[in-house]
Amino acid sequence: MKVIIDGDACPVKNILFNICEHHDLELILVHSIAHMSKGEQKIETIIVDNEAEAADIMIMNRTKAGDLVITADTGLAALVLGKRAFVLSPWGHFYTNDNIGSLLDRRYLNRKMMLQGGRVKGPKKRNKEDDHRFQQALESFLEKHLRNSSKQEGV
């Protein structure tokens, strides 16, 4: 399993760096050239053009069944689920086949309202509880999936 980060607006990169290093997991950060930063030497970093969907296309090309993708992009999440990979939001909520339809519907309705001049409430300001919820969800997921993969290897 590898962990792939949609890094253009990911507020939990440092948490991911630490946890993936602790579990010795392959970590890939994908972001546009507009979001380059220092301090990403320990992980594989893929920098794409600053074009619409360039990072999403690269993420889809690199994702395999069983991988974990971190993104807040509902459209990308739907595509990743189609590859039988797992998707976790930076708020610690998993996108699943059971909830993706309603999330896509909400995204569509919000976009429609904005195009008609309406206002759509954005996400709340991020706080430490959000980081904690994300870290707990990630650790729980990894504990379960790494344990299952080691059982399968021992069979």
Swiss-Prot record:
Any Pfam family matching the protein: DUF188
Membrane-spanning parts: none
Protein origin, superkingdom: Bacteria
Family assignment from sequence similarity: Belongs to the UPF0178 family.
UniProt-listed PANTHER family: UPF0178 PROTEIN YAII
Descriptive protein name: UPF0178 protein Amet_2995
Organism: Alkaliphilus metalliredigens (strain QYMF)
Source species taxonomy: Bacteria, Bacillati, Bacillota, Clostridia, Peptostreptococcales
